[in-house]
Amino acid sequence: MEEEEHEVYGGEIPDVGEMDGDMEALNPDLDMAAADDDAVKELDEMKKRLKEMEDEAAALREMQAKVEKEMGAQDPASIAANQAGKEEVDARSVFVGNVDYACTPEEVQQHFQTCGTVHRVTILTDKFGQPKGFAYVEFVEVEAVQEALQLNESELHGRQLKVLQKRTNVPGLKQFRGRRFNPYMGYRFRRPFMSPYMYSPYGYGKAPRFRRPMRYMPYQ
């Protein structure tokens, strides 16, 4: 049997690693092009993030400027001047409560015109335009306030008015309102209140002999 001969041209067949090395050696520009693409993409991402940060910072600055404008940022001297002016107006004004809903500013002005020169009458209303039942009367003279206080419990439209000196509201400061005098709560007893009618387990109207009387009664 004859042996078959196989001819190998060019020597031994190179392995896969050697072939890859040869391909890289033959195409050195492939890796450089891929690296350039990655660098370009990374640079674009950095530019995009930087643009987003700049837009966010600009939006924050715009929002801050808008808030400062709405809050009416003023210097302390201007705020103090406005507060002083408000206190001066309040010193010439009175609060009028229990005003009839059908009462007009002209009628309120006529009711207080004997006290002094009425500069302004303001009847407060709700969001629907309905009167709330109280008003503010501003006079030209400070002395008119004391005269107006004398009209407390005077009647207008058959209703007793409640006339008080107007308070000045200080911004950012909650004012303390003292409790009104109540003749039924002016004095508080230290002893707890006991009902005159108490349930007794010994029967109606009976109490154990070892108990002391609940209340002292000097007159029998």
UniProtKB/Swiss-Prot annotation:
Keyword flag Coiled coil: yes
A molecular function GO annotation: mRNA binding
Assigned keywords, A-Z: Coiled coil, Cytoplasm, Nucleus, RNA-binding
Domain spans labelled RRM: 92-168
Chain positions covered by the region annotation Disordered: 1-24
Recorded GO CC terms: cytoplasm; nuclear speck
Coiled coil: 34-74
Compartment(s) where it occurs, according to its Swiss-Prot or TrEMBL record: Nucleus speckle; Cytoplasm
Protein name, as recorded: Polyadenylate-binding protein 2
Gene for this chain: PABN2
